[in-house]
């Protein structure tokens, strides 16, 4: 997941509802997704813009840094959520439901948050531990680590289906070009996509 999921209140809420309904077994993302989601809970902004109106807030460009510093003060995302009374958002839903998440680092990260794995190999190993159980997968890196089938408890062999959703055609095509032939690409805005998924599952989403 990229941080675009947090830039609108409705997409942020939609994914939180999908997690609450038990449809997420694990979430892979980076520092930005967690940072801007927690910023949304703390300041009601993402990248300094109101998550509902997209209006710029005074000194909003500092909000994500203030959020990171506050999380680092408490020592963990879980403690930040507890101590700061966070009651909404993607990270809150993950923590509240006990859904595992892996946050991989980047050379572009501000901060980063305490639980972000700065070593790419450590992050890859952490993702692999969840991929063995996964049935829906995202991103080129994830796709390249994914087996083409899984063996069920009764010995049945079934294919693994996964979809890559991105606003750029290049991203979804690259996953197939690099060998993930089972991948199906969907070129769309992920914010609208995740809201439509939630609606299709019968979950209420404000719009």
Residue positions per predicted region:
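C-terminal functional extensions of proteins
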Residues: 51, 55-99, 106-207
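General beta-strand structural signal in soluble alpha/beta enzymes
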Residues: 1, 7, 27-30, 101-105, ...
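Metabolite-binding pocket within alpha/beta catalytic cores that recognizes anionic/polar moieties
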Residues: 1-74, 187
């Amino acid at each position: 997941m990229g941080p675009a999921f947090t830039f609108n209140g409705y997409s942020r809420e939609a994914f939180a509802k999908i997690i609450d309904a038990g449809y997420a077994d694990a979430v892979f993302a980076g520092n930005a997704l967690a940072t801007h989601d927690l910023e949304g809970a703390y300041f009601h902004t993402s990248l300094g813009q109101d998550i509902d109106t997209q209006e710029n807030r005074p000194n909003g460009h500092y909000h994500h840094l203030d959020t990171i510093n506050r999380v680092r003060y408490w020592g963990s995302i879980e403690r930040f959520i507890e101590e700061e009374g966070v009651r909404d958002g993607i990270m809150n839903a993950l923590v509240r439901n006990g859904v595992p998440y892996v946050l991989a680092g980047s050379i572009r990260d501000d901060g980063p948050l305490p639980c972000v794995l700065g070593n790419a190999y450590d992050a890859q190993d952490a993702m692999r531990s969840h991929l063995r159980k996964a049935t829906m997968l995202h991103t080129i890196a994830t796709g390249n680590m994914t087996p083409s089938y899984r063996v069920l408890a009764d010995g049945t062999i079934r294919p693994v289906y996964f979809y890559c959703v991105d606003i750029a055609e290049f991203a979804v095509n690259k996953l197939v070009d690099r060998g993930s032939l089972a991948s199906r690409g969907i070129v769309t805005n992920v914010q609208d996509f995740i809201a439509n998924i939630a609606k299709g599952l019968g979950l209420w989403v404000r719009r």
